[in-house]
Every structure is written in structure tokens, then in C-alpha cells.
Amino acid sequence: MAVSKTLQELADYLGGTLVGDGSRQIVGVASLDDATDSQITFLANPRYAPKVASTRAGAVILPPGAERHNHNAIMVPNPYLAFARLLTLFYVAPRAARGVMDGAHVGRNVKLGSEITIHPGAVVGDNVTIGDRVTLHPGVVLYEGVTVGDDVTLHANVTVYQGCRIGNRVTIHGGTIIGSDGFGYAPDGDGWYKIPQLGNVVIEDDVEIGANAAIDRAALASTVIGKGTKVDNLVMIAHNCVIGENCMIVSQVGISGSTKLGRRVTLGGQVGVAGHLEIGDNAMIGAKSGVPGNVPSGTIMSGIPAFDHREWLRASAVVPKLPEMKRTVAALEKRLRELEEKLESAV
């Protein structure tokens, strides 16, 4: 069903300041380029400020002090967050519970909450507990003893191994594996002896995990993904890692075993982190970096191996000049040799 709101209603919803016609009806959200006079748009990046003048939008979400060019406007401190909230308001439909559908398998001693949907092809093992308003899409597999909280969505082909715990308001996207064995082997002569992985994975509240990620169970105790953390597609988190609250882990990151991340840590795409390390609160690691040691809180690092980001920028600026520098050094060495030969012949 289409949603229509007045600008005044939207301003109240966002907690912003309305400038213009509060009775204007808005039916959707679009970009500065594509918005029509019945849609609202936003300016989050100053480089796009010139487009505000030419947009056809019925209203613009702007930061305080921005030029509105006679458009209706809602002024908010964080236009990007306001944009996200409006997308939820206009386009995210309420879920409709459908119960346990034909073709789903539910094991013994399973506790099911209210308003759930278990799609055909989903498998729920014995002694599983599922909270309220949970959706399990086709191909989801919950091994024995899994616990799932309220308002959880597991997309197609997610697998959660035995004994793992998923908190409230968690979303896990297709193909992700939670709780497979950690990569643990003891040297045994010329071979390797598998170390039984007896722990589990704990996913705390308000976590979102992308597609085809893998989070291994602990050898003992738990691998933990902290409250509010967001994990992108194709991320690997090894056994016994503890990820703090509200971290941001971007695609193709690999975190080796027993590493601990503090709160609000950001790891850029393809970062590799060695095992048994600690990365402090609010640290940021640039894309493709290799982290071989502990990282203090608040540090920004880049490079292989990772070091201070500002120093890395300076070092990176030198790299394209290395061929020229090599030629210059070779020429200087040649001149030095010639001078030495002249001095020797003059003696």
C-alpha cells in the first residue's frame, strides 16, 4: 500500500525544522537527479550542493545553513540518517506471519514464538528455541540446540550450527555459515591432529551479517559478535574472536583466531588481521591493510604491514616517483665515481 505523508509529518518524524509548505504531500524518496515533485530528496555530500538548485523534488533534506534555493526543506543535523529513516518509512512493508509452511521441517522439543514464518525447505533441529516475529527463509538450517531471539530474519541457505545463540533484531543474509568448526590443528608427527571445537558462536542484539560470511565456533567458550555490529559479505571471522559493539567490518576481511576488537572499530575491505591481537576502541584500518600487531584505541592505520595512516599517505606518494629516483641516484653514483677517479689520478 502506497504511503503518503505531509512535509510537516515528515519533519515531526525526523525531528527536523521545516522551511516551506508543511501541507505538501510526499509519496516517496529519490536522488537529487531523479526526484519528482511528489518525492523528497536529500543532500548528504557537499560536492552535490549545486544539484539542489536544479532538482525537481518536492522537498529537500538539508543540513543547517545549506542553501535551499526556494525549495521546501527539512533541516536536520544528519541528512544521510534522515534519508535512511525515510526509506524505512516509505518502502519497508510490515511482515506478515505465515506460520510453519508446508515443506518445512521442525524437530522435537522445539519452542516456537508467536507470529513466525518458517518457509518450505527450512530445517529446524531438535531442542531449538525460536522467539517472536522470526522469519526463516527457504534452505535455512538450524542445528540442534540453537537459540534465536525476537524479530530475527535469516535469509535463504543460512546455516547455524549446534548450540549457537542469535540475539534480538538480527538479520543474516543468504549463504552465511554461523558456527562451523574453527581452523584448529595440533602438530602430530608429519601430520595434524584436529582439535575438537567445543564452543559456540554468540550473535548479540541488532547485528546484521551479509551474504556468504563465515563465523567459526570457538574451541572453548564463545566466538562473540557484539551488539550493533555490521558485518559485510564474504567476511571470515575465526574461532574465539570477540568483536566489540557497533563495529563495521567491510567485505572480504579476514580476522584470525582469538583476536579481540574493541567498540566501534572499522575494518576496510580486504583487511587481514593476524591472530591473538587486540584492536582498541574507535580504531580504523584502511582497505587491504595487513595488521600484524596490537592497535591502540583511536588509531588510524593503513598499509602492509599497517602503520600510521598519515605516514602511509606520505609513503604512498613517493612510490610513483621511485623509478625516477632510481635513475637520479644511478646518475649521481656515476658522477661520484668519475670524480673519485679524477681525484685518484691527480694524486
Curated annotation (Swiss-Prot):
It comes from the Bacteria. GO terms for molecular function: N-acyltransferase activity. The keyword Transferase applies. Its EC number is 2.3.1.191. Pathway: Bacterial outer membrane biogenesis; LPS lipid A biosynthesis. SUPFAM superfamilies: Trimeric LpxA-like enzymes. Keywords: Acyltransferase, Lipid A biosynthesis, Lipid biosynthesis, Lipid metabolism, Repeat, Transferase. GO terms for biological process: lipid A biosynthetic process. Gene3D superfamilies: Hexapeptide repeat proteins, MurE/MurF, N-terminal domain. The active site is at residue 239. GO terms for cellular component: membrane. Pfam families: Hexapep, Hexapep_2, LpxD. Catalyzes the N-acylation of UDP-3-O-acylglucosamine using 3-hydroxyacyl-ACP as the acyl donor. Is involved in the biosynthesis of lipid A, a phosphorylated glycolipid that anchors the lipopolysaccharide to the outer membrane of the cell. Belongs to the transferase hexapeptide repeat family. LpxD subfamily. Homotrimer. This is UDP-3-O-acylglucosamine N-acyltransferase. It comes from Geobacter sulfurreducens (strain ATCC 51573 / DSM 12127 / PCA). The gene is lpxD.
